[in-house]
Amino acid sequence: MTTEFLVLSRQDLREAMHFADYVEAIAEGFQLLAEGRCESPIPTEIPAACGTFHVKTGSLPRGAGFVAAKINGNFPGNRNRYGLPTIQGAVFLADASNGQPLALLDSMEITLQRTGAVTAVAARYLARSDLGDSDDM
């Protein structure tokens, strides 16, 4: 069975997902990780002439569902030299049961939203209960 391969830009992701979607995905991911139902191997660094590539991978749940790999390049001189962002990258998503590529996603929107979502999840579970309702997160 062949599935359509999706390519989603940063703008596509902005339109398709809301911050609350990221918060719930992060909360679920942390729960699966705590239960040992997903893999999150140690990230890899690949040196380059003027920067570094960072490779982060994971599977959900435990290889039976999806495998993702995020590759971000961090090139501090990009803005001055080329007018490009310091950090650029992509997320590759595949079916873990048969290896079929499913999507290639711009990583910047995901990375930015994930950072905020992790903070929201931490606040949800670590904030003092007498500070008020955290359901807004």
What name fits each language-model region?
Residues M1-R114, V118-A120:
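N-terminal ligand-binding/catalytic initiation module
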Residues D95, G116-M137:
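Glycine-rich adenosine-cofactor-binding loop
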